[in-house]
A protein has these predicted regions:
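Signature of N-terminal electron-transfer/Fe-S-associated modules in redox systems
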Residues: 1-138
Length: 138
């Protein structure tokens, strides 16, 4: 629980108040996806979500995916398939993929592309698809 201006973007509460820096700042207008978190099961861009919109909701960040020192299946697939290059956008992509797979454990390529719309300057989109499909087939 934090006391601040209700219009403060959730991203800044996560990074500055909670000290969780896995959620990245990219564009600040909700387009790039580096700031993606999961709110009540939905992938959401935290830079354009006011903190007032998440009252009494479950907010998950990349840090919450690891359980008891073990990475989630999608995080492990990202490593196994050597997805990241610079890595800046990857936490947001993992969060978008996690939200998708929770709702749709066997998504089509079209559903995957519609759900993971994050921008990657390094162009790792094919590796992202391979990692997600590896989790789907496991």
């Amino acid at each position: 629980s934090v006391e601040l201006d209700p219009t403060t973007p959730l991203l800044w509460v996560i990074r500055e108040q909670a000290g969780l820096t896995g959620t990245k700042y990219g564009c600040g207008v909700g387009q790039c996806g580096a700031c993606t978190v999961i709110i009540d099961g939905e992938a959401v861009r935290s830079c354009s979500t006011p903190v007032s919109a998440v009252a009494n909701k479950k907010v998950e960040t990349i840090e919450s995916l690891e359980k008891n020192g073990k990475l989630s299946k999608i995080q492990q697939a990202w490593i196994d398939h050597e997805v990241p290059q610079c890595g800046y956008c990857q936490c947001g992509m993992i969060m978008a993929a996690t939200a998708l797979l929770r709702k749709k454990p066997k998504p089509t390529d079209a559903e995957l592309e519609a759900a993971v719309t994050n921008i990657c300057r390094c162009g790792t989109f094919q590796e992202v698809r391979k990692a997600i499909n590896a989790v789907v087939k496991a």
